């Protein structure tokens, strides 16, 4: 009986300690504390900025063991917004995002490595029906208690993708072959 009680107590402590270290966060999109933005050069003369307004996701964060961190994000590609209705309609077409056939893009991390003050988050990005590995450079912006009794953590991440890697072959000129991703998220720790 004592052995069983001791085993149960040790197992409880082990699982409690593990879950306290690696916390799961839900991206706070309702509070407008998360953004999935992008930019691409327009003819080499200026930047064109856009955002995806509808997305959801979670991340697991363990500051002491980044290799245990995980990121999962789903983006509704129909929500693309560049502040120009005709351009947005074109981006939703089969020439670009093909939202009728591929209504979602997803990112699922496969590894997280600490590089100085940053985290290199490598994962599989599925966009336009194609899945390719992508690495995002992320920085912890801050973490701690919020005024409502919860805990939060915020990150900013950047990365680049080549359009042709995702079967987007419309010729936009040599200056417009890559899209830069700028992602800012604040997560609310789940209980």
Curated annotation (Swiss-Prot):
SUPFAM superfamilies: YceI-like
Gene3D superfamilies assigned to the protein according to its UniProt record, in alphabetical order: Lipid/polyisoprenoid-binding, YceI-like (2.40.128.110)
Annotated localization: Periplasm
Domain of life: Bacteria
UniProt keyword Signal present: yes
Keywords from the named record: Periplasm, Signal
PANTHER family assigned: PROTEIN YCEI (PTHR34406:SF1)
Family of this protein: Belongs to the UPF0312 family. Type 1 subfamily.
The protein's name in its UniProt record: Protein YceI
Organism, as annotated: Salmonella typhimurium (strain LT2 / SGSC1412 / ATCC 700720)
């Amino acid at each position: 009986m004592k052995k069983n009680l001791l085993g149960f107590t040790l197992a409880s402590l082990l699982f409690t300690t593990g879950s306290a270290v690696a916390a799961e966060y839900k991206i706070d999109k309702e509070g407008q504390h998360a953004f999935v933005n992008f930019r691409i050069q327009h003819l080499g003369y200026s930047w064109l900025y856009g955002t995806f307004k509808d997305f959801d996701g979670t991340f697991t964060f363990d500051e002491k063991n980044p290799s245990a961190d995980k990121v999962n994000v789903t983006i509704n590609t129909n929500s693309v917004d560049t502040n120009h209705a005709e351009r947005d309609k074109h981006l939703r077409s089969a020439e670009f995002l093909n939202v009728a056939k591929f209504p979602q893009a997803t990112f699922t991390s496969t590894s997280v490595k600490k590089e100085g003050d940053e985290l290199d988050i490598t994962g599989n990005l599925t966009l336009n029906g194609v899945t390719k590995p992508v690495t995002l450079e992320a920085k912890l912006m801050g973490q701690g208690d919020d005024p409502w009794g919860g805990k939060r953590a915020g990150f900013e991440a950047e990365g680049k993708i080549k359009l042709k890697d995702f079967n987007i072959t419309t010729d936009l000129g040599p200056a417009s072959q890559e899209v830069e991703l700028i992602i800012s998220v604040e997560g609310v720790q789940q209980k």
